[in-house]
Amino acid sequence: MAISHIRLTTAPVLVVPSVSMEDMDRYPDPERNLAELIMAVQSVALACQNLLLAAHDAGLGACWLCAPLFVPDLVRDVLVLPSAWQPQAMITLGYPAESKEKARAPLESRVLWR
C-alpha cells in the first residue's frame, strides 16, 4: 500500500479513466443495458491502451493501476468526481528516473498459434 501511495502522490500526472452511462441510451432489456456498459468499459480500456502507447512513444513512463475498481467511492470523493462516473483505473505518467532495458521473451513463448 505504501508503494502505491508514493506512486500516486509523486507522479507528475495522474489520469483517472472513467465510465459514465448518464448519456447512454437505456433499454427495457437488462441484457442490452449490460452489453452497453461492457462496451463502454471496453472503449475506455482501448483509449487507455492508446494513451499508454502514445506515452511510451513520447518517452514517458506510465503505470496502470486498477485500484479504483476496489475503492470507486473513495476515488470519486478524493478527486471530487461526479457521482455518475465509474473510475476504471489510474494511470501515472512522467519521465522515468532511470531507464531499464528488459529482455523480451520469444513471441512463441507467449502466443499459441493454431
Regions found by a protein language model. Name each.
Residues 12-16, 62-63, 89:
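Structural motif
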Residues 50-51:
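Aromatic/hydrophobic pocket-lining residues that form π-stacking "cages" and hydrophobic walls in ligand
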Residues 39, 58-73:
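GST superfamily/GST-like fold recognition
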Residues 70-84:
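Short, electropositive alpha-helical surface patch
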Residues 55:
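Hydrophobic pocket-lining residues that define ligand/cofactor binding sites across diverse proteins
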Residues 19, 67-68, 95:
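Short secondary-structure boundary segments
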Residues 88-114:
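C-terminal helix-cap and adjacent tail motif
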Residues 1-43:
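Glycine/small-residue-rich phosphate/adenosyl-binding loop
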